[in-house]
């Protein structure tokens, strides 16, 4: 099912922190702290890291209530629905993401699904308390868009 999100971007050697700071600032500046418990938080590299460069981008999304109309200057997007394979993990260092994605991809190789390149892979933050206060260890789910090809 389609979902509307607000988008924040970061770019540099640690873009996740920049994107999260932009989202946190927007939440506090607009007094939307009460929305944190009822919304979902997704992120992904955008653009991906390039060989030889420590700089890359990260885009952070927060789902929006259906009644939210948006304000001038906000980037509102629609996340398409579809089928995703999901794998969860606990994050304590940035290096934790690689093995989590590798495990999900290894599952896919032997499954009845193929990667759906038309949709974005996502990382969903599950530890809501860390949205407003940065935590060193949080729970994430990795979402790989897939299409079922085998019966």
Where are the language model's segments positioned?
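A solvent-exposed interaction/effector surface
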Residues: 1-151
């Amino acid at each position: 099912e389609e979902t509307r999100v607000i988008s924040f971007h970061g770019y540099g050697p640690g873009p996740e922190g920049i994107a999260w700071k932009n989202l946190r600032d927007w939440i506090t500046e607009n007094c939307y702290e009460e929305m944190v418990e009822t919304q979902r938080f997704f992120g992904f590299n955008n653009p991906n890291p390039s060989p030889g460069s420590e700089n890359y981008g990260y885009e952070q999304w927060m789902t929006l209530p259906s009644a939210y109309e948006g304000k001038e200057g906000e980037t509102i997007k629609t996340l398409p629905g579809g089928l995703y394979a999901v794998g969860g993990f606990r994050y304590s260092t940035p290096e934790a993401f690689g093995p989590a994605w590798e495990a999900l991809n290894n599952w896919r190789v032997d499954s009845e699904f193929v990667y759906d390149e038309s949709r974005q892979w996502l990382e969903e933050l599950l530890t809501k308390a860390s949205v407003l206060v940065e935590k060193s260890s949080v729970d994430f789910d990795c979402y790989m868009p897939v299409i079922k090809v085998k019966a």
